[in-house]
């Protein structure tokens, strides 16, 4: 199969850094944080435009810190503990429990009756290892994206 993209690690890091503000903005909106793209640019550049609530600033800071953590630890192995650390970075400063750990209660998704399993009902180590052992890197990336 011909690959549409054949980017090096350095290419991917460059692309991620170029798209970081857009990624933070879109993640924030997905989570219901009411910010504009311009607000996100200002926040990322440490400009307080007075339009973002303190609560939303903490949420944006968590997203920014998580991206910085990922970019600064790019050579670390992807493990369950690494994923938990990213969760910690995203949620620190917010009222999220347990912070940096798997949830212990059920959750719902607006607009659907589907409920994900509790983490205690899953074998995340095995699931992650199965995905990471896929020899097709593009398939691995797609499956990992959907799994996380």
Positions of predicted regions on the chain:
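FIC/Doc superfamily catalytic core
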Residues: 1-148
